[in-house]
């Protein structure tokens, strides 16, 4: 089963509303679809969605890398030897995790379709047939709009992730308190700071974090502030998750050794694909650190891969964020994600178990705009 072609398709995709987190405002998304075909006609799909919070890659650089590095390296090689193919890529690509993630996903999809089994089976087997997901309430300067969004999403999700860090600490905490007052004591709340606080900000916030009843504090401090975050973990009675500070398996090892978090977010794009994400999750679990699966708000292909990854993990400490296609105006798969009882089903079809809409890819191709 030789690889016959590797293509990159940049998309002009947009969100239903502006999504704000950290220092980023996103109304459009730089997705790139990677399509790999074999000489016997099997096709697999992957998706890159490079965002500046995690990588220097751009939509244009992903396309260039696929065309000038990935395709020449993979075409003519045996697709069934996935790990050796990833090792081949590691030799020709420098730090390009989102590009590698798309290729890794496409190879897994291709192999699953060829074998007639779901990707979760290729990752070792599925521990669950559905994955709990959480709502995501984007940051807004107006607390009333934050509350409105939280109440709307509370109708669907048990857990809500809120965002803070863009404003003065007390004003951000006032927004979180307003949400708590609106949704009531039974809603499960987590907050993502995206590394926007300094150590003094985090210390100031400790008492109010407890009073608001937040259960998870994600990436309170920026990468590089691990000694301070270790102290924060020791002082807080709730979980602290590492996200931006875990961009490799080695980073997961560092979290375990230094105890700078009690949970690791193993988003597959930032880590360089499902293979690396699975390894990071295994490292964390072996070291007594919890695991959650996040995303960078990808479309249907990467989200389907995330569901298979989450299904293949024995223990998930928190709900996953894997229904982000619902945030988009456009869809690229025939199947639409359905959230039922705060869960999303994992497809049991071959490969990713999705049908990619080639007409939609042609329509959204940024090169045709």
Identify the meaning behind each predicted range:
Residues 3, 34, 41, 70, ...:
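Conserved, mostly hydrophobic/aromatic
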Residues 14, 48-56, 95, 136-140, ...:
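Glycine-rich phosphate/pyrophosphate-binding beta-alpha loops
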Residues 37-114:
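Metal- or metallocofactor-binding catalytic centers and their adjacent structured scaffolds
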Residues 124-236:
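Metal-dependent enolase-superfamily TIM-barrel catalytic cores that perform enediolate-based chemistry
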Residues 207, 213, 224-239, 246-343:
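Shared catalytic-loop signature of beta/alpha-barrel
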